[in-house]
From Swiss-Prot:
Protein name, entry field: ATP synthase subunit alpha
Reactions performed catalytically: ATP + H2O + 4 H(+)(in) = ADP + phosphate + 5 H(+)(out)
EC number: 7.1.2.2
Gene name tied to this protein: atpA
Keywords, comma-separated and alphabetical: ATP synthesis, ATP-binding, Cell membrane, CF(1), Hydrogen ion transport, Ion transport, Membrane, Nucleotide-binding, Translocase, Transport
Record organism: Buchnera aphidicola subsp. Acyrthosiphon pisum (strain APS) (Acyrthosiphon pisum symbiotic bacterium)
One GO CC term, this protein: plasma membrane
GO molecular function: ADP binding; ATP binding; proton-transporting ATP synthase activity, rotational mechanism
Length: 512
């Protein structure tokens, strides 16, 4: 069979039309050094700061140093098997973590992979770990409370949804306990919680998970873990990953609470990475951008407007405002709040809860110092009944602490001073609270009403705890409707005042 030139030409054209060229270009380079989780790469061009770099065995590094001829990157995980001369390439993407409702009740690592031994997690998408904070126009004022369940905090240092409130104090003063109790108190409120453990011992993290399970609060919580045994790169990344997970709920018009435990260890991990990258050290050997490290993280916590939620969901969700409330924790050394990292975070946040070792050791739990603890925006969000009943508590405590210091130098005190000291001691005793026992708004209101209206005058200090426990039981048994009404509305009026007086009078007459 002979083909003529026309048929040959047609056949060649068909083959050319069907020919597919599998041609793909990569921005590729090679590793020139590996040490302590830091790799130096030569040959990469057009690299973005924070870009993911693909390593052999489908592992990744993040570009943190971009120099004239080389790129410095930090490996996300083990680096033992990485060798010099290995080929790497740019991905053109920044790091993203999986997010979704299915992460609630689970323990994940800084990259969003489950580490609790349960099934894999079906995610609802991916969010970038580094994201811009909402602008001024997109924000809404903080005017809704978030209840911690602690009398001393909800009455004197109230926290609002969308606020950033620092918990600061020496080691072993109850910082984590306060944060965990706040999570436990949210199980009825519908607020989604994220607990980020940075540089903690695994035994401590296991204990936190166990306590949340025991108090039926784990179902509402995501735990992000970068333990002390993990690479500094993962400890650096963990808070940003946790914040991305919180932003998923905020963007749906829901309220979320995120706890960073703690940012001191986060700063140390970043210092380690920066020194290994040969960045110039500054004060306390921290790099120059240590303030920006925490400010860009904490500025993402805010309350956003309905328009923002509507815009970000492309009109799928309307009429809802979302929020991220951040409770960063900072550990001080011997009560020194003027150190570099504590002063940075104090200046970024909207207030601080200061926990003192001497108060903790003297049996006052939570060991909050009301004198230097402050909430800059939370008072606007405080429940009406708590706001009205707590106005005199801070003043009474401040006067008591001043007089207590003065009375050490004088044995001869007049009756007025003695009464003030006695009243202050009783209020201090009344504000004590055990761990894992948060109380409701109505219970707080009743206790504050007792303190504010001098119903403790005829009760000795050693019986205050018993009095508090029994009056709350009495209130739930005989005034259940009143307590439920206060929990729902948070209002305070003459009717509620009269019922409180009747309740306390009846209890003291018949039961105590």
């Amino acid at each position: 069979m002979r083909l003529n030139s026309t048929e040959i030409s047609k056949l060649i054209k068909e083959r050319i039309a069907q020919f597919e060229v599998f041609n793909q270009s990569y921005n590729e380079g090679s590793i020139i050094s590996v040490s302590d989780g830091i790799i130096k790469i030569n040959g990469l061009s057009n690299v973005m700061l924070g870009e993911m770099i693909l390593l052999p065995n489908n592992e990744y590094a993040i570009a943190l140093n971009i120099e004239r001829d080389t790129v410095g990157a930090v490996v996300m995980g083990p680096y033992i098997h990485i060798s010099e001369g290995a080929k790497v390439r740019c991905t053109g993407k920044i790091l993203e973590v999986p997010v979704g409702d299915n992460f609630l009740g689970r323990v994940v690592n800084a990259l969003g992979f489950p580490i609790d031994g349960k099934d894999s997690i079906q995610n609802d998408g991916f969010f970038p770990v580094e994201a811009d904070a909402p602008g001024v126009i997109d924000r809404k004022s903080v005017n809704q409370p978030i209840q911690t369940g602690y009398k001393v905090i909800d009455s004197m240092i109230p926290i609002g949804r969308g606020q950033r409130e620092l918990i600061i104090g020496d080691r072993q003063t109850g910082k984590t306990a306060l944060a965990i109790d706040t999570i436990i108190n949210q199980k009825q409120s519908g607020i989604k919680c994220i607990y980020v453990a940075i540089g903690q011992k695994l035994s401590t993290i296991i204990n936190v998970v166990k306590k949340l399970e025991e108090n039926n609060a784990l179902f509402n919580t995501i735990i992000v873990v970068a333990s002390a045994s993990e690479a500094a790169s993962l400890q650096y990344l963990a808070p940003y990953s946790g914040c991305a997970m919180a932003e998923f709920f905020r963007n749906k018009g829901e309220d979320s609470l995120i706890i960073y435990d703690d940012l001191s260890k986060h700063a140390v991990a970043y210092r380690q990475i920066s020194l290994l990258l040969r960045r110039p050290p500054g004060r306390e050997a921290f790099p120059g951008d240590i303030f920006y490290l925490h400010s860009r993280l904490l500025e993402r916590a805010s309350r956003v407007s309905m328009e923002y939620v509507q815009k970000i969901t492309k009109n799928k969700i309307t009429g809802k405002t979302g929020s991220i409330t951040a409770l960063p924790i900072i550990e001080t050394q011997s009560g020194d709040v003027s150190a570099f990292v504590p002063t940075n975070v104090i200046s970024i946040t909207d207030g601080q809860i200061f926990l003192e070792s001497n108060l903790f050791n003297s049996g006052i739990r939570p060991a909050v110092n009301p004198g230097i603890s402050v909430s800059r925006v939370g008072s606007a969000a405080q429940t009406t009944i708590i706001k009205k009943l707590s106005s005199g508590i801070r003043t009474a405590l401040a006067q008591y602490q001043e007089l207590a210091a003065f009375s050490q130098f004088s044995s001869d005190l007049d009756d007025t001073t003695r009464k003030q000291l006695n009243h202050g001691q009783k209020i201090t005793e009344l504000l004590k609270q055990k761990q894992y026992s948060p109380i409701s708004i109505a219970e707080q209101a009743l206790i504050l009403f007792v303190a504010e209206n001098n119903f403790l005058d005829d009760i000795s200090i050693d019986k205050i705890t018993k009095f508090e426990k029994e009056i709350l039981i009495y209130a739930h048994n005989y005034y259940f409707d009143l307590m439920e009404e206060i929990n729902k509305t948070g209002d305070f009026n003459i009717v509620i005042k009269d019922k409180f007086i009747k309740l306390i009078t009846e209890f003291k007459k018949n039961q105590f």
